[in-house]
A protein has these predicted regions:
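Pocket-forming structural segment of enzyme catalytic cores
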Residues: 1-74
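Acyltransferase
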Residues: 71, 76-131
């Protein structure tokens, strides 16, 4: 779990304007998009200590979100069933990381699912209806 901090660009963005300045999210990946600074068509919307480009927009056509805003009560354990995933998590965070991660995810699930609803509603109302 990690904190994602929104930048001022959030205020002008049709998908994320309604979000609080900071949200807690689930991130479990080995790769990330980096080094977009030179691309003038990319707008950074949110960042974290771990991943600079947590949320970014390309022009008005596409978004990149490098964390999971959507979870259910079995998400972490479902992923932990994959031996390579569990091993990678424990290599990075230590023995028992899966259980701790699962508890943190469950503790934050209601807020994360509320953020998912906001994102879906904004996408449905503002993106789909505009196009």
């Amino acid at each position: 779990m990690l904190d994602v901090n929104f930048l001022d660009e959030k205020k002008k963005d049709i998908l994320f304007a309604d979000f609080p300045q900071k949200i807690t999210s689930l991130q479990w990946h080995s790769y990330e998009v980096q080094e977009l600074e030179k691309n003038k068509d990319v707008t950074l919307i949110a960042s974290s200590k771990e991943t600079k480009y947590q949320i970014f927009r390309y022009k008005d056509n596409a978004y990149g979100i490098q964390f999971h805003i959507e979870i259910k009560d079995t998400t972490v354990n479902d992923w932990g069933c994959v031996p390579e995933y569990k091993s990678a998590l424990e290599n990075q965070l230590g023995q028992g990381a899966l259980e701790k991660f699962d508890k943190e995810a469950r503790d934050n699930m209601n807020n994360m699912n509320n953020y998912s609803k906001i994102l879906y509603t904004n996408f449905k109302n503002d993106i789909i209806l505009i196009k």
